[in-house]
Amino acid sequence: MFTARVARPMAGDDAPAASSGSTGSSAPPASSAADCVLEVRGVGKSFPGVVALDGVQFRVRRGTVHALMGENGAGKSTLMKIIAGVYTPDQGEILINGEPVVLNGPLDALDRGIAMIHQELNLMPYMTVAENIWIRREPKNRFGLIDHAALRRQTAELFERLSIDIDPETDVRTLTVASRQMVEIAKAVSFDSDVLIMDEPTSALTDKEVTHLFRIIRQLREQGKGIVYITHKMNELFEIADEFSVFRDGKYIGTHASSDVTRDDIIRMMVGREITQMFPKEEVPIGDVVLSVKNLGVDGVFRDVSFELRAGEILGVAGLVGSGRSNVAEALFGVVPATSGEIRIDGKPVRITTPGQAMKHGMAFLTEDRKDTGCFLNLDLLANMEAAVLSNRYVKFNFVRQAQLKRDCEEMSRMLRVKSPGLHEEIQNLSGGNQQKVLIGRWLLTQPRILILDEPTRGIDVGAKAEIHRLVSALAGKGVAVLMISSEMPEVLGMSDRVMVMHEGRMTGIVDRKDADQVRIMDLASR
């Protein structure tokens, strides 16, 4: 276990203002080989159609907390998964304590002193807390069986050291999300790793629990650990991080001491470009209020969301991961019914508890995860496109007007420029962009008045994105009211008449198009 504490800031850092407009990579501040517990050099990683990391570099010094900042899709999580052995890089190298290593999976990374606390908790719900922490490392008695007394004892000792008040014999499934998070942290600490990666560790914690976590982090820092801390919360950066690095669009932008910058400096580094004209939007007349939402909420998820949506309007919804954006869409469409608040359509109160009820009121919902909740991957285009209309105008006397439905699906496929051998091609064989077009076509066949789009261009190429943007703008021009949720700031700013911003389950503001820019939206999204 290390005992040395390395002093804060790195002399010779570039000024934050100079980095704010940078589009390339600048070298991390100089530090000796003995100082670095972890270093990444020129690492790149691509997925089909997407460059997630483009030759990035990154260093973590002993006895420091190094925050990683960037918008959704900046490459932070991909880099951390490479460091933790989950992904294999396409290029570049990783050095641990100055020595190049090849990580052959997460267990290999653990053996080399790198532990990661994932945002998505990875505990076994039907095992006890102690069994989860020491899985694969259980103490054995002289007969080679698990020594349960020793297991409880060493868990209790670990918890005492970390001031965690949880019974080691409790089944994980009975714990709150916050308690599970503390168990995950304790498990990572139990490996006595040199590097701990924490991905949004406070997302489920109360203020009191955050204070407790920060006390643990400071304790680990004093022991000489290198801690990588991924967060969207700027106040946490200034409270706990010694230094931070910013990533943008898969590129490394720069590293600075936390004490040398302001909140606005960081936002400018994360934003880095003027994009307001990248998505030209047609000016169309805005009509009457179609959808009115007042104090909408789902217990424990989001609360007090209020807004109006007019015919021909595109209302963008921005916010960081976990802000509640998608949950609002699910409540509106009856996937997870609202537990409080009121929904009105054309001024009349409606109760929506199922997607079928939402569809009867003229609503359509394109979900954010096309593979898990959108596409029927082993079915063909026709089956996927007709899925939402089989109880609609194509059914008469309990018979489906199959010929008419097929003609309309063919016409929709042509209009959306879906590239495929034909309607009987399995949708899993199509590109992401063409899959998305099929799903949009599915909902357009229902002739919706209110169209909810959750991440409409996620994971598709630039050309397909442009086509979908043109389509959404054209639908608004025909009077469709569009609610568009997106993690891509250029898309939100370029396509929206107004932008609603959410943070941690509550609405923090609605900004008119003329007043919206990335700095203002990011400020509202991190309040």
Swiss-Prot record:
How would you describe this protein's topology in the membrane?
A: Peripheral membrane protein
Annotated EC: 7.5.2.11, 7.5.2.7
**Catalysed reactions, as listed in the record:** D-ribose(out) + ATP + H2O = D-ribose(in) + ADP + phosphate + H(+); D-galactose(out) + ATP + H2O = D-galactose(in) + ADP + phosphate + H(+)
Entries under InterPro entries matching the protein: AAA+_ATPase, ABC_carbohydrate_import_ATPase, ABC_transporter-like_ATP-bd, ABC_transporter-like_CS, P-loop_NTPase
This protein's source sits in the domain of life called Bacteria
Biased composition annotated in UniProt, kind: Low complexity: 12-31
Segment Disordered: which positions? 1-31
What enzyme category does the UniProt record give? translocase
Record Pfam families = ABC_tran
Q: Which UniProt keywords apply?
A: ATP-binding, Cell inner membrane, Cell membrane, Membrane, Nucleotide-binding, Repeat, Sugar transport, Translocase, Transport
Name one cellular component (GO) term.
plasma membrane
The terms under GO molecular function for this entry are:
ABC-type D-ribose transporter activity; ATP binding; ATP hydrolysis activity
Q: Which residues bind ATP?
A: 70-77
Localization: Cell inner membrane
Instruction: Cite the ABC transporter domain residue spans from the record.
Output: 38-274, 284-523
Question: What does it do?
Answer: Part of an ABC transporter complex involved in carbohydrate import. Could be involved in ribose, galactose and/or methyl galactoside import. Responsible for energy coupling to the transport system.
Q: Which family does it belong to?
A: Belongs to the ABC transporter superfamily. Carbohydrate importer 2 (CUT2) (TC 3.A.1.2) family.
Query: Any idea what this protein is called?
Result: Putative ribose/galactose/methyl galactoside import ATP-binding protein 2
Q: What organism is listed for this UniProt entry?
A: Burkholderia lata (strain ATCC 17760 / DSM 23089 / LMG 22485 / NCIMB 9086 / R18194 / 383)
List the top taxonomic levels of the source.
Answer: Bacteria, Pseudomonadati, Pseudomonadota, Betaproteobacteria, Burkholderiales
